[in-house]
Amino acid sequence: MKDYTLNTKCVQAGYTPGNGEPRQIPIVQSTTFKYDTSEDMGKLFDLEASGYFYTRLQNPTNDYVAAKIAALEGGTAAMLTSSGQAANFFALFNICEAGSHIVASSSIYGGTFNLISVTMAKMGISATFVSPDCTEEELNAAFNENTRAVFGETIANPALTVLDIEKFAKAAHAHGVPLIVDNTFPTPVNCRPIEWGADIVTHSTTKYMDGHGAAVGGAIVDSGKFDWMAHADKYPGLCTPDESYHGITYAEKFGKEGAFITKCTSQLMRDLGCIQSPQHAFILNLGLESRQVRMPRHVENGQAVAEFLEKHPKVEFVNYPGLKSNKYYELAQKYMPNGGCGVVSFEIRGGREAAEKFMKNLKLAAIETHVADARTCCLNPATSTHRQMNDEQLLEAGIPAGLVRISCGLEDKTDLIADLEQALATVS
């Protein structure tokens, strides 16, 4: 559906039914698949034929939805994972091994910060975190001979910093490595990182893509633009024979358009099994079909709430890149001219105690670890999503102890503002 608009792709990309076939994508609720001969199945295990042999690796329902997300992001191949964290781990681990090094923005989701700084460190993979506001010189200084990937979030959770995608892509490519961008918050409706130089895009589909808090999942999209063979010395996993698949070399057999996702699916899914269930993929697709209609409402509500909070005397500061006073406003206008997302973070005067009292008195907004839902929700990141960080790391990530993150849903903005106003009135 290359010639159609993004709005149409949200509804129809990824699945084209034949004569007499289901109009909605079918849920293939089966762990395995039948073949007439051992030879037919053997070709699948040798990656000599396309098809399905076990849902731990692939499933038709998942592939329909992955194809839609690839079309929305402008990529050549995509896959679904069991969660956004699985997507980020697979995207990095697919090209990193013991001794590898990652350059990452310091302003990212706490779980991803922990994944890179702690869990992957136990695997022998080191990382250098840089401020998204760093100069080009500071960014380039973070690389070393073992750097294999650069990672950042389009809009960081929860500090709402905006990644200068072109700056990070330029540095990554100058050092012969890909840029991986988590595009969860804006979704491809509001930003397509591949168009700005990103090579791999990840998503927590649990958030705006599903949009209803119904299905946990993740996705990885490959732009098909990074030339792995041109940097074969850095990526032996893609550019040298894989003994677990009879000596296949992914970059040679599948080219730069298909090597990354094929290896990720056939090797990492086989060994680690972080597959999204077909039922969750089906639910995700229902969310995707209305994504282009829902996202503007989230942005409208986020903008209205941010403007209200910015003027309130009990609010210390507001993070929202749609505000003209925000330091990321110009970057947001460049990369997301139609708006970013419905998530706003702000600090109430009085610190953590005031923040907790404010949240306790909200009526519409529930305290949840979730974000990007049809229903408005909030939390204090320092005591929840980012509680594994120490005070220094919190400040580096732009997360003071009294910060409140509010995810504006699809309710009427006047009701949301009234709820915020009455809750703020309870804070002395």
State each model region's role:
Residues 221, 345-347, 407-409:
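Short hydrophobic/aromatic beta-strand micro-patches
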Residues 32, 223-226, 348-353:
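Short loop segments at secondary-structure junctions
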Residues 117, 126-127, 141, 145-148, ...:
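PLP-dependent enzyme catalytic core of the Aspartate aminotransferase-like
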Residues 37-89, 111-119:
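Conserved N-terminal alpha-helix of the aminotransferase class I/II PLP-enzyme fold
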Residues 1-59, 67:
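N-terminal "arm"/small-domain region of PLP-dependent enzymes with the aminotransferase-like
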Residues 272-275, 279-281, 286-290, 295-297, ...:
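Conserved small-domain helix->loop->beta segment predominantly found in fold-type I
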Residues 7-16, 78-311:
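Conserved PLP-enzyme active-site core in the AAT-like
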Residues 74, 314-317, 402:
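Glycine-centered tight turns that cap/initiate beta-strands
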